[in-house]
UniProtKB/Swiss-Prot annotation:
Protein residues bound to ATP: 86, 88-89, 109, 121-122, 172, 179, 258
Enzyme Commission code(s) on record: 2.7.7.-, 2.7.7.108
Family from the record: Belongs to the SELO family.
Keywords for the protein's UniProt record, in alphabetical order: ATP-binding, Magnesium, Manganese, Metal-binding, Nucleotide-binding, Nucleotidyltransferase, Transferase
The name this protein goes by in its record: Protein nucleotidyltransferase YdiU
Organism: Salmonella choleraesuis (strain SC-B67)
Top-level taxonomic group: Bacteria
Amino acid sequence: MTLSFTARWRDELPATYTALLPTPLKNARLIWYNDKLAQQLAIPASLFDVTNGAGVWGGETLLPGMSPVAQVCSGHQFGVWAGQLGDGRGILLGEQLLADGSTLDWHLKGAGLTPYSRMGDGRAVLRSTIRESLASEAMHYLGIPTTRALSIVASDTPVQRETQETGAMLMRLAQSHMRFGHFEHFYYRREPEKVQQLADFAIRHYWPQWQDVPEKYVLWFEEVAARTGRLIAEWQTVGFSHGVMNTDNMSILGLTIDYGPFGFLDDYDPGFIGNHSDHQGRYRFDNQPSVALWNLQRLAQTLTPFIEIDALNRALDRYQDALLTHYGQRMRQKLGFFTEQKDDNVLLNELFSLMAREGSDYSRTFRMLSHTEQQSASSPLRDTFIDRAAFDAWFDRYRARLRTEAVDDALRQQQMQRVNPAVVLRNWLAQRAIDAAEQGDMAELHWLHEVLRQPFTDRDDDYASRPPEWGKRLEVSCSS
């Protein structure tokens, strides 16, 4: 089957990009590709059979219909206007036309210098490329909206970060790479007509049902706010910390994008800071909902030339509504509740207080809770708490709450185990795969990808265990 590509961004949004070709790496080689995603997208297996070089995966060749461009965007970093930020190392190769008429961006990260590279070198390193591939696929199989990873190319090109590393490329796929920062770029350049063109592009291709509706811009922004709210709710319930929620890392479609200093909670710590460069804790775990709203407010500001402020403020309310509604639904599912009762939040917050005080493992606590039997006061979770009297008191109230619903244990446990993962991408697991890959051994990278495809399956190996102490102390930075 022949793949078809279009170039809607290039054709419809002039002055938002620079056309250029990727810059290949030295001795590039394909080390991993996403076989399941490739099958879903009808990508011929022959494209991955590259024995001499890395082909399209390393930017050495293009497929028919591809018209590569580097997109320009700006944004706020750590709450401060930073001006033009990129795309300094990513190139949109083209947009694949799918059978249902939709499209999918093929975006090559680490593709070389662009006019927007600022002081950067246009490269990505193997370490960060592996992390992003693992994280995006882990999030997908957890059911959280995200960009996807299609392939990784390694090389012998030296790249200087904190230490000397080697260059790599990631083929990232997404329905769109449109970010809040695209709108900010033209708003601060005092080009409101281009901001409106971006909004028109988004509506035309992703919300076509509103194209001819007079209030289309308000409806569109309401949906952006709601999608962002639902996304943040998903992050908070699964214990995901993004680490660098700058406005240029926020997706118009409500996707998780730009995996840098991310982390999943090990010990439950609501103030967890995954990014060691975040000295003020702006992007700490429990501040993510507030930061997302702040970012939406920055996006709303760019829309003031063609949306009234009152309408924008009403639309922003959709964020909080979506966040709280979706978070409440998800947490009730995690606790095994089928109905909403007035004291549910009290019970949840009491559990969080216990977990924070004891340093309980976030994912394992909820997974173990999913094995609760209403009539049994014993629980394997009890042995993980030092203050067993406090746990027993909470557990009695929890079982009493379960008995208020006419749901048997088997059905409830089944629901809980569909939303409480046994496996998440802990930083130490990613680091183990990286360490092996940097020595030329890709087996752990491939196997970890397989493990992450079944996050809700119980395991008795270390992929589902608490991290070793050294694994809790790994520092992650924006360096990638």
